[in-house]
C-alpha cells in the first residue's frame, strides 16, 4: 500500500521537531583534570604560588545545565588541598562539595580525588576555589554554566561573553602571613594589590608586565561575568563612560538593573550587559577598588584594566586618550546599599521566585568578632569570631562522614537557634566586655524539606564590619535587610516575599541585619560561613545537618570509593 506523501512529510517534520527540541537534547559528561601545582610568578615580584594547571586565575569550567562534571583533582604540592565548587547545589552529592573537614577530608600530597556532580536546574556564572588554609588566594577560577541547547537567555543575546575575575595579591607568602598572625592572635597585613584577570594594572603600586585589555566593537553588546575571588575585600567595579545592566547574580536571573557601579562581595558573581556605545576614539579605564566602612587596615590600591574599541586591530592603542573612571569613595556605604537594595529576582513564568511564605525554623544568628584570653598573644587576647557567641572548632574527621556513618564524638547538633543572652547588638562594646566566646563543633539539625528563616544580625563587638555569608548546598532569598537591631514585630511586615533576590552569598551590613529564607531540600552537611577568609579563620562559621527524607530520591548518596582519608 502506498503511503500518502502528506503523511510522510508530517511524520518527518515531527521527528525533526523532536530531535531539535531542547527537552530531547541529551546532557553530556564533561571531564576535567586539575593539577594543583607550584609555579613562579613575576607579578609584583618573583615568588612561588600554588595554582591549578599553572594558571592564575585557574582554568574555566564550561558546561551546560544538566551536564555531569567529572573533575580529577591531583595534589602535587606540600599542603593538604580541597576545592569547593562555589554555588553548585550538589543535590544529594555533598561528597563533591569540597570544604575540608566538612564534606571530605583534604586531599593529601601525592593523592587525588574525583569530584562527580550534575548541574541540576542551574545556569549562569559560579566559581571554584580552594577551601583549606588561605590557598584560594591563587587557587580559583570561573564556572560558566550555559543554558540547555535551544533555551535562550531572558534578555537579548550578547555579541560575546567575557569573564572578569577580581582578586587580591600579596607580595609575601600568604600562608606564612596568616600563620604568624594566628600565632600572635591578630590580623595579618592587608594585600598589596588587587587584580583583574591576574593583572594589577598600570596605576597600581604593584605593576605587572601588562594590564588586562577588554576589546569591544562599536555598537555591540557584551556580557561580562564578574567574580569577586578576593579573600577579604568587598569591591566596587566600574567602566568609565559606560552603563552596565545587571541581569544575573550568583547564577540566578534578575530583573534588569542599570548602574554605573557594581558592588560585589567576596564569593559573589554578577553578570552585566555592556553596550559599546561610547566614543571609539578613546580608551576607557576599567577599575576595581575596595569598599569598607569599618575602621580597619585595608588594601587601598585600585586595580585597573583598559576597555578599547577595535576595528582591524585587537591591541590597545597607546596614542588614544584614556578616560578615567570616577570611583566612589572607599567608604561609600550609600552606593553599596543602593546597589544591593535594587536587585530583584526575575520572577517570570520560566524562572519563578519560589519564596517560602511560611517558616518552620526561625533562627536568629548574631555574627561578629570577639576576643578570648591568650597568654602568648599580643595584649593577652586572641581575636576570634562567632555566631551566637560560638566560635566554630574545625573537626579532625569530615562532618559528612561522621553524619553518614553515625560516628559519635565528632560534632553535636545543639547549635543555638538564638543568642543565649540578648543585648543591644549594635551598640559599641569595649574590648574585654562580654567579648569572650565559647568553642564548639556545633551543628543545627533540620528535617528534610523544612522551611527556614535566618536573621543574620551584625554586632558591634570589637568593631562593626560587613560580613558576606555563604551557604553551601542551597540558594536562598534575601527577604529583608535593615540597619540597627532587628525588630521581630515590625521588620517582617516589610519583607519582600514576591521577588526578592535569590543568591548563595549575601552581605550583612555593618550595624545592621539581613533576613534570608530557604527550603532544606538537600540532605547532607552544609557549611555556612563568612566569606571574608580572615573571619572564617577566626571561627565565623557553622554547619547545618539536613536529614534524609522519604525514599532514595530524598536521601544522600553513599560516598565514593576514592573519598580522601584524614
Swiss-Prot record:
Cu cation 3 binds at residues 131, 472, 529. Cu cation 2 binds at residues 86, 129, 531. Glycans are attached at residues 39, 80, 116, 300, 331, 389, 406, 449. It catalyses: 4 hydroquinone + O2 = 4 benzosemiquinone + 2 H2O. GO terms for biological process: lignin catabolic process. SUPFAM superfamilies: Cupredoxins. It holds the Pfam family Cu-oxidase_3. It is found in: Secreted, Extracellular space, Apoplast. Its cofactor is Cu cation. Cu cation 1 binds at residues 84, 470. Keywords: Apoplast, Copper, Glycoprotein, Lignin degradation, Metal-binding, Oxidoreductase, Repeat, Secreted, Signal. Cu cation 4 binds at residues 467, 530, 535. Its main location: secreted. One of its GO terms (molecular function) is copper ion binding. Its EC number is 1.10.3.2. Binds 4 Cu cations per monomer. It is an enzyme of class 1 (oxidoreductase). Belongs to the multicopper oxidase family. This is Laccase-16. It comes from Arabidopsis thaliana. The lineage of its organism: Eukaryota, Viridiplantae, Streptophyta, Embryophyta, Tracheophyta. The gene is LAC16.
Amino acid at each position: 500500500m502506498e503511503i500518502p506523501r502528506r503523511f510522510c512529510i508530517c511524520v518527518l517534520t515531527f521527528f525533526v521537531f523532536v530531535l531539535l527540541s531542547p527537552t530531547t537534547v541529551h546532557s553530556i559528561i564533561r571531564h576535567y583534570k586539575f593539577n594543583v601545582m607550584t609555579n613562579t610568578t613575576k607579578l609584583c615580584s618573583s615568588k612561588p604560588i600554588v595554582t591549578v594547571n599553572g594558571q592564575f586565575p585557574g582554568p574555566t569550567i564550561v558546561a551546560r545545565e544538566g551536564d555531569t562534571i567529572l573533575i580529577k583533582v591531583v595534589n602535587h604540592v606540600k599542603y593538604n588541598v580541597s576545592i569547593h565548587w562555589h554555588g553548585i547545589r550538589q543535590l544529594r552529592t555533598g561528597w563533591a562539595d569540597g570544604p575540608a573537614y566538612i564534606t571530605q577530608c583534604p586531599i593529601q600530597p601525592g593523592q587525588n580525588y574525583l569530584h562527580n556532580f550534575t548541574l541540576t536546574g542551574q545556569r549562569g556564572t559560579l566559581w571554584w576555589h580552594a577551601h583549606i588554609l588561605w590557598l584560594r588566594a591563587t587557587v580559583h577560577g570561573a564556572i560558566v554554566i550555559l543554558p540547555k541547547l535551544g533555551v535562550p537567555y531572558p534578555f537579548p543575546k550578547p555579541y560575546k561573553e567575557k569573564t572578569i575575575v577580581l582578586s587580591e595579591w600579596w607580595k609575601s607568602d600568604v600562608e606564612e602571613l596568616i600563620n604568624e598572625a594566628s600565632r600572635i592572635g591578630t590580623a595579618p597585613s592587608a594585600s598589596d594589590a588587587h587584580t583583574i584577570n591576574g593583572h594589577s594594572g598600570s596605576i597600581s603600586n604593584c605593576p605587572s608586565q601588562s594590564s588586562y585589555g577588554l576589546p569591544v566593537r562599536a555598537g555591540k553588546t557584551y556580557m561580562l561575568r564578574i567574580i569577586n575571588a578576593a579573600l577579604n575585600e568587598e569591591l566596587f567595579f566600574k567602566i568609565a563612560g559606560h552603563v552596565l545592566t545587571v541581569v544575573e547574580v550568583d547564577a540566578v536571573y534578575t530583573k534588569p538593573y542599570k548602574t554605573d557601579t557594581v558592588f560585589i562581595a567576596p564569593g559573589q558573581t554578577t553578570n552585566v550587559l555592556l553596550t559599546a556605545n561610547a566614543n571609539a576614539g578613546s580608551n576607557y579605564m576599567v577599575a576595581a577598588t575596595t569598599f569598607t566602612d569599618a575602621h580597619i587596615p585595608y588594601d587601598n590600591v585600585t586595580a585597573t584594566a583598559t576597555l578599547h574599541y577595535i576595528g582591524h586591530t585587537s591591541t590597545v592603542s597607546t596614542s588614544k586618550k584614556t578616560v578615567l573612571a570616577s570611583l566612589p569613595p572607599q567608604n561609600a556605604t550609600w552606593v553599596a546599599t543602593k546597589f544591593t537594595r535594587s536587585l530583584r529576582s526575575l520572577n517570570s513564568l520560566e524562572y519563578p521566585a519560589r519564596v517560602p511564605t511560611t517558616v518552620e525554623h526561625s533562627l536568629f544568628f548574631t555574627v561578629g568578632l570577639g576576643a578570648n584570653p591568650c597568654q602568648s598573644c599580643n595584649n593577652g587576647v586572641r581575636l576570634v569570631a562567632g555566631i551566637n557567641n560560638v566560635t566554630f572548632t574545625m573537626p579532625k574527621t569530615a562532618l559528612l562522614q561522621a553524619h553518614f556513618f553515625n560516628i559519635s564524638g565528632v560534632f553535636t547538633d545543639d547549635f543555638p537557634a538564638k543568642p543565649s543572652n540578648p543585648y543591644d547588638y549594635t551598640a559599641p562594646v569595649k574590648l574585654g566586655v562580654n567579648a569572650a566566646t565559647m568553642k564548639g563543633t556545633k551543628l543545627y539539625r533540620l528535617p528534610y524539606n523544612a522551611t527556614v528563616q535566618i536573621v543574620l544580625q551584625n554586632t558591634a563587638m570589637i568593631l562593626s564590619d560587613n560580613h558576606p555569608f555563604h551557604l553551601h548546598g542551597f540558594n536562598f532569598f534575601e527577604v529583608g535587610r535593615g540597619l540597627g537591631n532587628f525588630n521581630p514585630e515590625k521588620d517582617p511586615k516589610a519583607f519582600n516575599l514576591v521577588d526578592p533576590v535569590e543568591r548563595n552569598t549575601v552581605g550583612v551590613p555593618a550595624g545592621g541585619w539581613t533576613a534570608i529564607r530557604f527550603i532544606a531540600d538537600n540532605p547532607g552537611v552544609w557549611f555556612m560561613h563568612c566569606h571574608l577568609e580572615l573571619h572564617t579563620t577566626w571561627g565565623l562559621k557553622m554547619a547545618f545537618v539536613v536529614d534524609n527524607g522519604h525514599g532514595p530520591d530524598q536521601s544522600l548518596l553513599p560516598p565514593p570509593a576514592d573519598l580522601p582519608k584524614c
